[in-house]
Amino acid sequence: ASDVYKRQIYMSTYKDKDGDWLDGGVNYVLHLPPDVPAESFWSMTLYDVDTRCIIGNEQHIADRSSRMDLVVNEDGSVDLYFGPDAPASKEANWIPTVAGKAWFPYFRLYSPGKAFFDKTWVLPDIEKA
């Protein structure tokens, strides 16, 4: 395998699919298609726009990853949830946000696979839930 596959890829955004700034008072979902091309693992971590530090919340949860016991859809896809309200029966896939606090995510691929580079797997936009 090429040395490039031993690296990490970081993807980020400050806006949702509609072009609106990510807002801690709004609930969002990110639908990860099946077979995320990460030979080691993938992770999603949220950060505070003002401090650029890991997002603070009462639950002390700032990330989710493929190394966790997430709820996986029948087709192998995973829905990640961000917002002040936990999604019913999918709390394992939720990263809480705080109203009044802007945030941004880093989605990381550790040992990214070929499907990322040839764009046969594409990370969708975050959408309002």
Feature names for model-found ranges:
Residues 1-5:
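Short, small-residue-biased leader/transition segments that mark boundaries at the very start
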Residues 24, 38-40:
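Short loop/turn segments at connectors of secondary-structure elements within structured domains
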Residues 62-129:
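TerminUS-proximal long segments
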Residues 28, 42, 78:
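Residue-level detector of short, conserved catalytic/binding motifs and their immediate flanks
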Residues 6-17:
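Short beta-strands within extracellular/lumenal beta-sheet-rich domains
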Residues 15-31:
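Contiguous beta-strand segments within globular domains
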Residues 32-36:
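Non-cytosolic beta-sheet module surface loops
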Residues 41-59, 66:
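Extended low-complexity, serine/threonine- and proline-enriched intrinsically disordered segments
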